[in-house]
Amino acid sequence: MKIMGILGIQGDIEEHEDAVRKINCIPKRIRTVDDLEGIDALIIPGGESTTIGKLMVSYGFIDKIRNLKIPILGTCAGMVLLSKGTGKEQPLLDILNVTIKRNAYGSQKDSFEKEIVLGGKEIHAVFIRAPQVGDILSKDVEIISKDDENIVGVKQGNIMAISFHPELSDDGVIAYEYFLKNFVEKN
């Protein structure tokens, strides 16, 4: 059984753990850099990206995660943290060749749910102060999901990033299955 680490600094950690169990993987909450040992993949959940970034710096996660050779899934703020830039000064992992528009859909009250397609399957996506991809900075970045014309899912190498919260919808398991099949099992 594959072990999926979930960065346990902020966000819907328990909901991600439940989703990981649904795809017959073992969740492991990552609270220290030592916890990264022995995992097959890492999930960076949503939350507040500036706060998570500062905590990642404080706990020594930035360089450790940058040097991981395992698949990484970033959801919402996790997408922001993986990116090359946001137009705002904040700590980033700087490993996904995209720029991000933070809070592209507006404030908390502008949050919404919508059916979108990921990996050829329809999924009920929950967008909470969600980001969008601004610019794609290299040819190896592939678009895997859109909301109308807005890019809300990309992949590059062993990295997958989505701007919505799959852990908050009943069929969000589709996103985890996609990550497992297309990244974790191929690693």
From Swiss-Prot:
InterPro entries: Class_I_gatase-like, PdxT/SNO, PdxT/SNO_CS. CDD domains: GATase1_PB. It catalyses: aldehydo-D-ribose 5-phosphate + D-glyceraldehyde 3-phosphate + L-glutamine = pyridoxal 5'-phosphate + L-glutamate + phosphate + 3 H2O + H(+); L-glutamine + H2O = L-glutamate + NH4(+). GO terms for cellular component: cytosol; glutaminase complex. L-glutamine binds at residues 47-49, 102, 128-129. The active site is at 76 (nucleophile), 165 (charge relay system), 167 (charge relay system). Keywords: Glutamine amidotransferase, Hydrolase, Lyase, Pyridoxal phosphate. GO terms for biological process: glutamine catabolic process; pyridoxal phosphate biosynthetic process; pyridoxine metabolic process. One of its GO terms (molecular function) is glutaminase activity. Pfam families: SNO. Belongs to the glutaminase PdxT/SNO family. In the presence of PdxS, forms a dodecamer of heterodimers. Only shows activity in the heterodimer. This is Pyridoxal 5'-phosphate synthase subunit PdxT. It comes from Methanococcus maripaludis (strain C5 / ATCC BAA-1333).
